[in-house]
Amino acid sequence: MEEHMEAGSRLGLGDHGALIDNPADIAVIAAYFLLVIGVGLWSMCRTNRGTVGGYFLAGRSMVWWPVGASLFASNIGSGHFVGLAGTGAANGLAVAGFEWNALFVVLLLGWLFAPVYLTAGVITMPQYLRKRFGGHRIRLYLSVLSLFLYIFTKISVDMFSGAVFIQQALGWNIYASVIALLGITMVYTVTGGLAALMYTDTVQTFVIIAGAFILTGYAFHEVGGYSGLFDKYMGAMTSLTVSEDPAVGNISSSCYRPRPDSYHLLRDPVTGDLPWPALLLGLTIVSGWYWCSDQVIVQRCLAGRNLTHIKAGCILCGYLKLTPMFLMVMPGMISRILYPDEVACVAPEVCKRVCGTEVGCSNIAYPRLVVKLMPNGLRGLMLAVMLAALMSSLASIFNSSSTLFTMDIYTLRPRAGEGELLLVGRLWVVFIVAVSVAWLPVVQAAQGGQLFDYIQSVSSYLAPPVSAVFVVALFVPRVNEKGAFWGLIGGLLMGLARLIPEFSFGTGSCVRPSACPAFLCRVHYLYFAIVLFFCSGLLIIIVSLCTAPIPRKHLHRLVFSLRHSKEEREDLDADELEAPASPPVQNGRPEHAVEMEEPQAPGPGLFRQCLLWFCGMNRGRAGGPAPPTQEEEAAAARRLEDINEDPRWSRVVNLNALLMMAVAMFFWGFYA
C-alpha cells in the first residue's frame, strides 16, 4: 500500500504512466463496442420502430428483467462512478443514502404511480397532466422545464464525469473522445428507439456490475480488506497543508481531516453535511420527482408488458441499487487511503496541478483506482464500464427528451402526421447532440469538485413543486388546473429565489468559503426542498378549493382511487385528440393516404429502402407490415391500459417487495 501512496503522491496532471494503450485493453474495448452495436442491430431487426408507440415505448412489450436493468442503467451514469466515489472519498458513507433511499421510492413508482399512468394511456408525464387537468400551459411548462434540466444538468454531469475519467485514464483529447461517444450513442438512439435502448441497457448493466465488482475486489485487497478500510480511512490525510498563496497560508485541519461521522449514514440534523431529517424526508421528495415523474425513468416502466412485469422490474432495480455503497462509495474511500496527496488534496495550487481545479480532486478517486490498480485487459474492461454508463445515461436522455419534444411540444402543430413525428423525434436527438457538444467548454470550465453537489441542489430548488403537483394529481381528486398551475409558478419563483443567489455567489469551498448571505444559502438544500414541497402543495390545494372542481366524469382512471373504474372517461383533451382524426387523408396518417392514392408510383430504390429500414420508417411500404386498423388500435389500447394482475404472480412480486424492503432496512440500521 505504501508504494501506491508514494506513487500516487508523485503523480501530477501531466504524468500518464498507466494509460490504456496496450493491445489487451484495446481489444476489450473494441469487443465491448461490437457487442453493443450487435445488440442494437438485433433489436432493430426484432422490434417495431415504425410507429410512435414502437419507437418511444418499445411497443409496451418488455418483460421484467430488461425493465429493471434499464431503470438501473438509465440512473447509474458515469456521474455516479465519479460523483459517488468522490463524495465518499471526501465525506464518507452518507452519500450512499441517496441510493438506498431510492430503494423505497422505486416501489412507489411500481405500486402507486405506474398503475395510474397505464390506465391513463399516456406516453409522457406532461401528457398525463394534460389529461388530468386539461389546458396546455401545465404540459408546456413541464416539457420546457424538463428539457432545460436534461440539457443543462443531466448532460453536463455525464459529460463532466466522462471527461474526468477519460482524461485520467487515457490522456485523450476531451473533445474528440466525448464527441465520438455522443456520435455512437446518437446512432443507436436515432435508429433503434426505446427497445434498442432497453436491450443495450440490459447488456450494459451486466458490464457495469461485473466491472465494478472486479475493481472493488482489487481495491479491498490492496487496502487490507473490509476491516482495513475502516481502520485506515480516518488517517487518510494529505501531507501538503500549507498553501503558497499568502491569502490562504496554513489550512485549517477541518478542511483536510476526514469527518468524525464518516462511518455513519444518519448525521447530526444541524452540523451534518447530510442531516438525517433532510436525508429521510427531503431526499424522498426529490427522489419522488426523479423516480415517479421524470420522463427518463417512467418511460422505461411504461414499456413493461403489464403491471406485474413493471413491479418486478422495479424490484430488480431496487436490489441493484443496494450495490453502489459497496461498488462506488467504499472504493472512493479506499482511493483516498491509497492516494491521499492527490484525492484528498487541499492546497489550491496542488489540486490545480493534480486535476486541473482548485476546489479539490476527490472526483478523480475512482479513475485513479482504475489506472493504478487494474491489470491490462481489466483496465480496458473498466473503461468499457465507464463508457457503458456514460452512453446509457446519455441515450436515455436523448430518447426521453425526443419523446417530450415530439409528443408535448411539436404536436401543437395540428397537422403533424405519424411519419412527421417520427422524423422530428430523430432530428431532435441530433439537435441535443449538437447542444451537448457546444456545452462541453462550460462543463470543462466548471468547478468540478462542486459539480455533483451542485446538481443535487439544483434538483432541490426546481423539482419539489413538480413532485407536489404529481402527488396531489394522483391522490387528491379535488385539485384542478388552476391550483396545479399556480402551485408550479409559486414554487418556481420560490426556488429561483434560492437558486439565483447561490449561482451568483458560487458554492465556494472549505479553504475559500462562499460569500452568499447565511439566510439565503446556509440552509441545507434538502431542508429547503422540504419547505418548498409543502409550500407548493399548500398553494395548490388553497387555489383549487377557491375555484371550481373538475367533474368526476373527467377523472376515471386518472386518479389512484378511480384506477379500476369501468365508466367511460370524457378526456379534457378530447378535442385535441379528435381533431387530427378526420379527415384521415389530410391529418391522421397522410403517408398512408398517399400510398393508397398512388399505388402505381415506383417503389424506392435499394439505397433508399436500406436507409428507411435503418431509421425505422419503412412501415406500411411494400413488403412491410400493413398499418393497423382503427379497431385493432382500439383493442390494443384497451389491452395496454389493463392493470389486472394474475393473483399468483401478484403475490410473488408483493412478497419480493417486502423482502427487498427488509434487506434495505437492515443495511440502513447497520450503517446508521
UniProtKB/Swiss-Prot annotation:
Q: What is this protein called?
A: Sodium/glucose cotransporter 2
Keywords annotated in UniProt: Cell membrane, Disulfide bond, Glycoprotein, Ion transport, Membrane, Metal-binding, Sodium, Sodium transport, Symport, Transmembrane, Transmembrane helix, Transport
Lineage, opening ranks: Eukaryota, Metazoa, Chordata, Craniata, Vertebrata
Protein family: Belongs to the sodium:solute symporter (SSF) (TC 2.A.21) family.
Fetch the InterPro entries from UniProt.
Answer: Na/Glc_symporter_sf, Na/solute_symporter, Na/solute_symporter_CS
Checking Gene3D superfamilies in the record gives: Sodium/glucose cotransporter (1.20.1730.10)
Q: What are the TM regions of this chain, as residue ranges?
A: 23-44, 64-85, 94-114, 137-166, 174-195, 196-217, 276-295, 310-331, 376-406, 424-445, 451-476, 482-504, 523-546, 652-670
Record Pfam families:
SSF
Q: Region Disordered: which residues?
A: 571-601
Per the record, its GO cellular-component terms are: apical plasma membrane
Q: In which tissues is it expressed?
A: Expressed in the small intestine and kidney.
Self-association state and partner proteins as the record states? Forms a heterodimer (via TM13) with PDZK1IP1 (via N-terminal transmembrane helix); this interaction enhances SLC5A2 transporter activity.
Q: What is its main location?
A: membrane
GO biological process terms on file? renal D-glucose absorption
